[in-house]
Amino acid sequence: MSFSSEVKEELVKKTDSARHCQIAEFAAFMGMSGNVSETDNGELCLEFVTENELSVEKFSDLLLRIFSIKMDADTNEMVKNGKETIIRITRQSDVAKILQTLKWCDDRFTQIEPVFVDARIVAMDCCKKAFIRGAFMERGSISDPNKFYHYEIVCKYEEDADILMDMLRFFGLDAKVIVRKNSFVVYMKEGNNITDTLNLMGAVVSQMNLYNVMILKGISNDVNRKVNCETANLNKTIEAAVKQIKDIELIRDTVGLDSLSDSLMQVALLRLENPDMSLQGLGELLDPQVGKSGVNHRLRKIGEKADELRQSMGISV
């Protein structure tokens, strides 16, 4: 099962006790995938069309909780059409209740105007969270966090995407909108934003699972950075040792190591005998012992001597 499916499996079991939050979540399902049409006899009909079985389960549950509407009644139906499931509400008393609850009609039931969401329905913070949950359940997805972080909800219209983006930003989340083919996608790519969104939707188990992945990836990245740093330092050490040996060999083969002072010659001989030894190791072999900085100072003096010889011989330094 994908991580996105795991999140939705958790959310389908999440039910707010407050009726106003239930209405907000129901409004999200209708705003994302609902519409108003007319039957052959001219009566109004509400349809909810989805390819998501979990959305069907949650939508049916909300119909029952909010409006006491069951889908086994003769005048309301649920049909399969290929991958799609169509929930059709045709009983006029049920249609009226839903339209009025969603604020899709006036008080006299004379003017029908479906909207993505009426501002009054999501006025409270808890209702905004419920709406975001419903929108994600119906048209959202989250990538496998082991690969990359990406949260999105696909909207039909730009104004709908802007409303949803503003809701997420209300909670301090860095949501943005992009155009993809004929859709408008509300998305986030930062791990902490996604964990916070999972929390506000009520998917706390999925939030913890994502945290665990982020921690493990962070540890892995830290290890890689440390290895890269140590490799870079090792390369510098090797390059320095090669340069030191070339300097010493030049002096030995031209003017002789005995041209050096006793302290420099002692370090030079030890370096030739121990080409891969650290400066600290070389210092411990000296008599008397010398610290790392002392060895580095002597090798630098040897390098200066070698550069002087190169210049006198017309060799580029």
Swiss-Prot record:
HAMAP family: HTH_type_WhiA
Record bears the keyword Cell cycle: yes
Gene designation: whiA
DNA-binding region: 278-311
Family affiliation: Belongs to the WhiA family.
Domain of life: Bacteria
Residue ranges of coiled coil: none
GO terms classed as biological process: cell division; regulation of sporulation
Annotated PANTHER family: CELL DIVISION PROTEIN WHIA-RELATED
Keywords assigned: Cell cycle, Cell division, DNA-binding
InterPro entries hit by this protein: Homing_endonucl, Sporu_reg_WhiA_N_dom, Sporulation_regulator_WhiA, Sporulation_regulator_WhiA_C, WhiA_LAGLIDADG_dom
KW ATP-binding (keyword) present: no
Protein name (record): Probable cell division protein WhiA
Alphabetical list of Pfam families matching this protein: HTH_WhiA, LAGLIDADG_WhiA, WhiA_N
Protein task: Involved in cell division and chromosome segregation.
